[in-house]
């Protein structure tokens, strides 16, 4: 997560540093939590949503929490082949992240909205017109 944060700040600017190491550890550990040796989350969308939710809400970094949260989510989705190689609908993702940061949605709703964004994005990628959009 620290590497993602450093890349976000290098690309977009902002103050470096961790405000609270324990909150950062908590945000990273939550999606990896287990009970009796079994992961509490196994669905990749739910795990990506948890990274987005906890990194965004815990505000462990001095600056760039929302950007880092979204980047972590997108990196996780991409590493699980759930993020097509195309332009993301920026306005929808921005609204989504701002809602998470403003406590307008809980973790379950974060998962539902992420699932909707990813499925909507996948449908757009499969549409007959997507090849035209992607070739321009």
Enumerate the predicted regions with their spans.
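FIC/Doc superfamily catalytic core
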Residues: 1-136
């Amino acid at each position: 997560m620290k590497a993602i944060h450093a890349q976000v700040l290098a690309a977009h600017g902002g103050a470096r540093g961790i405000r609270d190491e324990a909150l950062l550890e908590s945000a990273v550990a939550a999606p990896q939590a287990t009970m009796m040796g079994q992961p509490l989350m196994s669905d990749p969308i739910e795990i990506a949503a948890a990274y987005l939710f906890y990194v965004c809400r815990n505000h462990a970094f001095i600056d760039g929490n929302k950007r880092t949260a979204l980047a972590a989510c997108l990196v996780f989705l991409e590493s699980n082949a759930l993020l097509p190689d195309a332009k993301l609908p920026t306005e929808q993702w921005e609204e989504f992240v701002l809602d998470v940061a403003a406590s307008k949605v809980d973790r379950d709703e974060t998962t539902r909205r992420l699932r909707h964004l990813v499925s909507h994005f996948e449908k757009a990628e499969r549409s007959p017109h997507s090849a035209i959009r992607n070739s321009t």
